[in-house]
Structure formats: C-alpha cells, structure tokens
Amino acid sequence: MSKEEAIEVEGTVIEPLPNAMFKVKLENDHIVLAHISGKMRKYFIKILPGDKVTVELSPYDLTRGRITYRAK
C-alpha cells in the first residue's frame, strides 16, 4: 500500500478464522476480512473475539484489510 494512502478505521473482532484471518465489524457496520500485520505476528500479539482493533483498508478493495493495532 505504498503508492496509495491506506484508509484506517476502528472495528471489533467478531470471529477468528484459520491462517490468522479475522472477521471484523467496522464502526460503520460493514464486515471485512482482515489478516494480522507482520509485526503483530512476529511479536505474538494475540487477538480474541471482542477485541477493539485498528484496520487498514486499501482504497482498491474495501472488503479486505490488515489489522495494525489491538487496543488494550
């Protein structure tokens, strides 16, 4: 996402899926499929259903995203 600016939105994890994928419900009630960013995977940050997260969405595909932050 280096060429275009990513869209950052807040959301809540609904359901964990295989391969570090998650269904996330955004603040505007859209549901997106999101994967964990590399740094979160590297440092073993656990994400559970109900966690508040920040998701980066590409302007080209608003149905998929990357989880970049888990709120405490």
Swiss-Prot record:
Subcellular location: Cytoplasm
Source species: Geotalea uraniireducens (strain Rf4) (Geobacter uraniireducens)
Function: One of the essential components for the initiation of protein synthesis. Stabilizes the binding of IF-2 and IF-3 on the 30S subunit to which N-formylmethionyl-tRNA(fMet) subsequently binds. Helps modulate mRNA selection, yielding the 30S pre-initiation complex (PIC). Upon addition of the 50S ribosomal subunit IF-1, IF-2 and IF-3 are released leaving the mature 70S translation initiation complex.
Record domain S1-like: where: 1-72
Main location per the UniProt record: cytoplasm
PANTHER family linked: TRANSLATION INITIATION FACTOR IF-1, CHLOROPLASTIC
Signal peptide: none
Protein name per UniProt: Translation initiation factor IF-1
One of the record's GO cellular component terms: cytosol
GO molecular function, one term: translation initiation factor activity
